[in-house]
């Protein structure tokens, strides 16, 4: 998968198109990512020890990884991700600027 936890991404399609956020979690087997502040859904929660009031909560839902693009750390624009070997290790590279993605 081209994005990992902690990456800054921009949504390129769907109801949240244009929104930016960081990846909170990645689910590689399902090719989905959880992005901060994107794809908010209402969850109905029963009263519990943690939440004695219960009620309706707003939380993020996962979106498909093909609907997000990485934000280039150098230019701040969205970019595709490439891979190259450096010191015997496979590293991710921003296609627009050639910057190595940490």
From Swiss-Prot:
SUPFAM superfamilies: Translation proteins SH3-like domain (SSF50104). GO terms for biological process: translation. InterPro entries: KOW, Rib_uL2_dom2, Ribosomal_uL24, Ribosomal_uL24_CS, Ribosomal_uL24_KOW, Translation_prot_SH3-like_sf. CDD domains: KOW_RPL26. It comes from the Bacteria. GO terms for molecular function: rRNA binding; structural constituent of ribosome. Transmembrane segments: none annotated. PANTHER family: MITOCHONDRIAL RIBOSOMAL PROTEIN L24 (PTHR12903). Part of the 50S ribosomal subunit. HAMAP family: Ribosomal_uL24_B. One of two assembly initiator proteins, it binds directly to the 5'-end of the 23S rRNA, where it nucleates assembly of the 50S subunit. One of the proteins that surrounds the polypeptide exit tunnel on the outside of the subunit. This is Large ribosomal subunit protein uL24.
């Amino acid at each position: 998968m081209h994005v990992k936890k902690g990456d800054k991404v921009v949504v390129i399609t769907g109801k949240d198109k244009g929104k930016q956020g960081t990846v909170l979690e990645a689910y590689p087997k399902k090719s989905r990512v959880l992005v901060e502040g994107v794809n908010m859904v209402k969850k109905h929660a029963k009263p519990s020890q943690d939440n004695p009031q219960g009620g309706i909560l707003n939380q993020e839902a996962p979106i498909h990884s093909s609907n997000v693009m990485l934000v280039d750390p150098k230019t701040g624009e969205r970019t595709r991700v490439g891979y190259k070997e450096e010191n015997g290790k496979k590293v991710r590279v921003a296609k627009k600027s050639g910057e190595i993605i940490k």
